[in-house]
Amino acid sequence: MSELDNVLRLPAEQMYAHEIEVLISAETERIPTGWKMSPRSVLTYITGGKVKGVEISPKYIGNRRLVEVAISTLLTDRALLLIGEPGTAKSWLSEHLSAAIHGDSTKVIQGTAGTTEEQIRYSWNYAMLIANGPSREALVKSPIFRAMECGGIARFEEISRCASEVQDALISILSEKRISIPELGYEIPAAKGFSIIATANTRDRGVNDMSSALKRRFNIIVLPTPGDIETEIEIVRKRVKELAVNLELQAALPADDAIVKVVTIFRELRNGMTLDSKEKIKPPSGVISTAEAISLLTNSMALAACFGKGKITSEDIAAGLQGAIVKDEEKDKLVWREYLDNVLKKRGSEWRDLYNACKEMNA
């Protein structure tokens, strides 16, 4: 077993290294400065296709035009902001754009309430600072600093979770394309190819509004939830299969019927309406995302492998549904019970096992 085989999750540029190598070797178009491949090849990497007889798997299943706008934005001097509800593949798309364009998706700042301006610009190795005073050797460079030096892409995840004054530290970086270090009396200009891809949630707790001045420095793309149930089912099926292989889950992949049921329940609760639009549904307090449907089915496989017979049952799915939907014990338990009694119970016999398992979990 190689060292990489023992890693729980590889960065995109390593996980899909063969596809990236094929696209680079087959390149016939002009490659922008600082990029590994042409914009058209980046699009093929993200949306899928066939190159030199090699199948390039789609990384993002959705509106192709949005991906084209994202790629073209990174050709300009504008940064890119991907916004949307939780689970709309913002981080996933950000990672794969960075991997395809620069070959490195690991220059990441994770935005939190505790993120400081030093984590955006630079900080110091204080032992060296005290011993020798300010020097380049004592400088601790942020991911954005390192991306500016090499002309790469820095990723800023959950930017809206940072305090507003910390967010605004980006304004001068995005405007001037340089970081000043007054302690050393010099500044670092951004090399060609440098850009920032930020992500932000539109519907979540614990977020801070971005200032208009900061928003003006970004090209903003809103990533929607999957437009139809067929697309969402395809996304869930593909990701569950990939995760099952990566995690070496010793259980059969979920049947199409199980995926359809989970996605149907999630879409109806998310939209507050049954799929046939005949009955309104009270939505739960939390966000019911595609990412959670993927996580639910993956966990159901783990349950089936460890404590079942290697095949997902209604009881495995019911356990996952309970945890995914009932996030607020007081409000969501009632919402879930009403959905079971008013919607799921009235469906045909093929839903009966899942209904009974869910009722038992929600007792």
Model segments located where?
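C-terminal engagement/docking regions of AAA+ P-loop ATPases
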Residues: 305-363
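A general alpha-helix detector
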Residues: 217, 235, 299-302, 320
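Amphipathic alpha-helical interaction segments
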Residues: 77, 104, 131, 221, ...
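Non-catalytic, well-ordered alpha-helical scaffold segments
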Residues: 64, 68, 142, 168, ...
